[in-house]
Amino acid sequence: MPYEGQAFQKKIFYEQKKVNKTLKTFGFDHTAPHSLPTQLYYTKGSPDNLFVSGANTKKTYTKFYGWPINKISTTFPCRYKSFNKKNFINILFLPYDFRLGKIITNSLNSFLNKASDKSLNKFIVKIHPVKTTDLKHILLKKELDNIIKHHKKKFTNKSNYKLSIVVGFTSAAIVALEYGLSVLHICPDPIFDKYSNYFWKDIDIKRIDNYSFLYKLKKKGKYLDFKSNDKIKTILKNEGNRS
């Protein structure tokens, strides 16, 4: 099943094994890795084999989250097969929810204050699809749009610098990085939101202020390996032939 380490998923696997001890369970961590994926720690009820979408994710899970190396495999990141790089370029993605809008506005201000004139392409602020009519999100977007207008000297239509801006606890940062973009990550709660080189060694991290960090990827394909084989499809085919 698509596996996120949720309690009910572990319960399903655990109860299935009680009924049939020879049953082999599979989980697919179908998202790009989050900054601190503690919910995926290997424990009672974890699947017999977990599929992840990149070698560095496998390395991190085995080193820090207790996964035996023989119980975790890499596979094609099929969730992102239909994603389009253009949908990440020059966009500031607002999260599903937020508490401290001031941190978001201050961090964007800090980043733009430090940017050189005409170094950036103008970007748009995008409200989460579920929150497009939410007044709190609409007001924050308006405030961010005003900040962008205030820093109009920073923008041009000719910059080759491709940037994506994400906010909070989100795996979208990794997706954008794997598309070859730079990522500004605004982290209202840096301890949980920020990617750390302690876990994720292939990300170059530059601090902008206490709540925002600029990322670049040292080598593509380490977290979302679009060149890998779809092992899940192969396993399902083999299991179907046995039945």
Language model: regions and residue ranges:
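Conserved catalytic-core segment of nucleotide-activated headgroup transferases in glycan assembly
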Residues: W67, S73-K141
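N-terminal pre-catalytic "stem/leader" segment of glycosyltransferase-like enzymes
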Residues: M1-Y14, I104-N106, N121-K122, R242-S243
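Active-site and donor-binding regions of nucleotide-sugar-utilizing enzymes
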Residues: M1-F76, S171-A173
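Catalytic binding pocket for nucleotide-activated donors in carbohydrate/polymer assembly enzymes
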Residues: P47, Y65-T74, K141-K142, S171-K233
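Hydrophobic/aromatic residues located in beta-strands of well-ordered beta-sheets
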Residues: T25, L50, F123-V125, V183
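A donor-sugar binding/catalytic signature common to diverse glycosyltransferases
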Residues: F28-D29, P37-Q39, Y61-T62, K154-N197
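Short, charged/polar "capping" segments at the starts of alpha-helices
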Residues: F8-K10, S35-L36, T57-Y61, S82, ...
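Nucleotide-activated donor-binding/catalytic signature segment of Leloir-type glycosyltransferases, i.e.
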Residues: K136-K153
